[in-house]
Curated annotation (Swiss-Prot):
Assembly notes: Part of the 50S ribosomal subunit. Contacts protein L32.
Record key words, sorted: Ribonucleoprotein, Ribosomal protein
Protein name (Swiss-Prot/TrEMBL): Large ribosomal subunit protein bL17
Gene: rplQ
GO biological process: translation
NCBIfam families, alphabetized: L17
Organism: Synechococcus sp. (strain RCC307)
PANTHER family membership: LARGE RIBOSOMAL SUBUNIT PROTEIN BL17M (PTHR14413:SF16), RIBOSOMAL PROTEIN L17 (PTHR14413)
A Pfam entry, by short name: Ribosomal_L17
InterPro entries cross-referenced by the UniProt entry: Ribosomal_bL17, Ribosomal_bL17_sf
Source domain of life: Bacteria
Phylogenetic lineage: Bacteria, Bacillati, Cyanobacteriota, Cyanophyceae, Synechococcales
Length: 116
């Protein structure tokens, strides 16, 4: 039984779910905003905020953890350079989720997640 399982399944096996969240996190940090389903946006928020917190820490170990998660090496270096000045006074809450119109076809709840 799956009592108190805190991971949103998102209808995928674990390896596919992790790859999808890594790709969405990379895209969100690169572009600044991503349109996706509401459930994916909520799962993406946790991963993105974890990466920004690592970037604010700025240590070598944090940089290596981020390099192991985010697909683009130059993006990690840019994130670590700009995170402390952009989010230095903020303790969490680096993203914003805005609900939009349902998706045509399957009526899934859609949302825009963006960096604050």
């Amino acid at each position: 039984m799956r009592h108190q399982c805190r991971v949103p399944q998102l209808g995928r096996p674990a390896d596919q779910r992790k790859a999808m969240l890594r790709g969405l996190t990379t895209q969100l940090i690169r572009e600044g905003r991503v349109t996706t389903t509401k459930a994916r946006a909520k799962a993406l928020r946790d991963e993105t905020e974890r990466m920004i917190s690592l970037a604010k820490d700025g240590s070598l170990a944090a940089r290596r953890r981020a390099l192991g998660y985010i697909y683009d090496k130059q993006l990690v270096h840019a994130l670590f350079d700009k995170a402390s000045e952009r989010y230095g006074d903020r303790n969490g809450g680096y993203t914003r989720i805005i609900r939009t119109v349902p998706r045509r076809g399957d009526n899934a709840e859609m949302a825009i997640i963006e960096l604050v």
